Regions:
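Short, surface-exposed ligand-recognition loops at beta-strand->loop->(often short) alpha-helix junctions
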Residues: 1, 204-212, 252-253, 297-307, ...
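N-terminal accessory segments
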Residues: 1-26, 42-57, 344-367, 371-376
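Short amphipathic alpha-helices in soluble, non-transmembrane regions
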Residues: 8-9, 42-43, 215-220, 256-267, ...
Length: 404
């Protein structure tokens, strides 16, 4: 049976587009939306289950599947419209490649996602992973105008487009953002761009954690909002103390004004980085957790950071911690047993803080789930959505987890 399916895949995609991964799992590399759809129709007909991949840095290779479907063949930057500040790209385009192309037109995608530079744009959107710039430019969903996706049974859906539209009913584009591939394979994305800032300045300050969070509240109360205000644990910054990093971006005059307000308001000894050191620092911050066994994000408001930081310290190892000091949000990277993650999720839920398991070995993902337990009434809705977009459960994605 498996040889017959592989032969049909080779006939469909070409021999060079079907191989095996290091563990012997068949891997398909379709190069168009139509090819992805045809692959999934064949897989659905054959009863196979599918593991979705970009460049393979986010999905665990031990996820049990009959086929690994990678978007690496979807690597074209389709259109870039500087006048409209919009780009259309395929999901397999690496983020560093997109950055270089947009810079040619003095534009950028205002995202600094964690992970390796070659992470695909599709994986960033599917996991909704954002870095420090989320505080100033918004989460991943704010940068995605529309998309093309393919369902588990091979149907092509195209919600949204290259302009912002107000549409009654459910926002299908936002459903795909952060859905971890449970609702379809992203193949094409329409992205909102920005002009490159004329000035980009980073300030660093070192102090005890409680003092830094207090200063962040002072800045917020004073209406000072840099594009990033990130609280970093010693393990992230390779320092002996916690660090607060403030990043101001925009016109030269606007940045100068923001810097002056920060220095006037914040009771800290700030150190301004030159361009080269700032680039190296943010590269370190973005990629510090790439080798961690698992990463977790918590949707905490800035006012609740101190309490959540204490909870994380009590129930997980010290790990690496990134926290949005002005707008909230926290990420942790390290290693933890499933029962410790469940305990933290339960305690966070009591405080109205969602916990998302971003990355982990498959056994942990399956036990804990990306989202875990839902509020009353939400679980059945998610199950119904999965039935719509993956009616025969072809995608290997653990959203809810399995209780012990």
């Amino acid at each position: 049976m498996s040889h017959d399916v592989l032969d049909r895949l080779r006939s469909l995609l070409g021999p060079a587009s079907v191989s095996r991964d290091p563990d012997g799992v068949p891997r398909a590399v379709p190069d168009s939306t139509d090819a992805v759809a045809a692959t999934l129709r064949l897989v659905d007909e054959s009863g196979w289950r599918v593991r979705l991949e970009g460049h393979g840095s986010w999905v665990p290779p031990d996820a049990s599947a009959d086929l690994a479907l990678t978007t690496r063949g979807l690597d074209r930057i389709v259109t870039v419209h500087p006048a409209d500040l919009v780009a259309t790209v395929e999901a397999g385009v690496p983020m560093d490649v997109l950055r270089r192309r947009l810079a040619d037109d003095r534009m950028w995608l205002a995202l600094d996602p964690p992970g390796r530079p070659e992470r695909t744009v599709g994986s960033i959107v599917a996991t909704a992973t954002a870095g420090a710039l989320r505080g100033g430019f918004g989460p991943v969903r704010d940068h995605v105008l529309g998309c093309t996706a393919v369902t588990g049974d091979g149907r092509v859906i195209r919600p949204g487009g290259t302009v912002v539209k107000n549409v009654a009913g459910y926002d299908l584009t936002k459903l795909q953002v952060g859905g971890f591939g449970a609702f379809g394979v992203l193949t094409t994305l329409h992205l909102r761009l920005r002009a490159l800032p004329a000035a980009d300045v980073t300030l660093l300050a070192r102090a005890p954690r409680d003092h830094l969070t207090s200063v962040a509240r002072d800045l917020a109360d004073a209406g000072v909002q840099p594009q990033a205000l990130e609280l970093l644990s010693p393990a992230v910054s390779a320092e002996s103390e916690w660090i607060m990093a403030a990043r101001c971006m925009g016109s030269a005059g606007g940045v100068a004004g923001d810097l002056a307000r920060i220095l006037d308001t914040a009771d800290l000894a700030w150190n301004e980085l030159d361009v080269e050191r700032a680039h190296a620092f943010w590269h370190l911050v973005t990629h510090a957790g790439s080798g961690a066994a698992m990463t977790v994000r918590l949707g905490v408001l800035a006012a609740g950071l101190d309490e959540l930081l204490d909870l994380v310290g009590q129930h997980l190892d010290e790990g690496l911690i990134w926290a949005g000091a002005s707008q909230g949000g926290m990420r942790w990277a390290g290693d933890a047993a499933p029962e410790h993650l469940r305990t933290l999720r339960h305690l966070a839920a009591e405080r109205e803080v969602p916990l998302t398991l971003e990355r982990a070995p498959w056994a942990v993902r399956r036990a804990v789930g990306h989202f875990g337990a839902y509020r009353e009434g939400v679980g059945p809705l998610v199950a119904q959505l999965r039935e719509v977009f993956d009616p025969t459960s072809r995608f290997v994605v653990a959203l809810g987890g399995v209780e012990p």
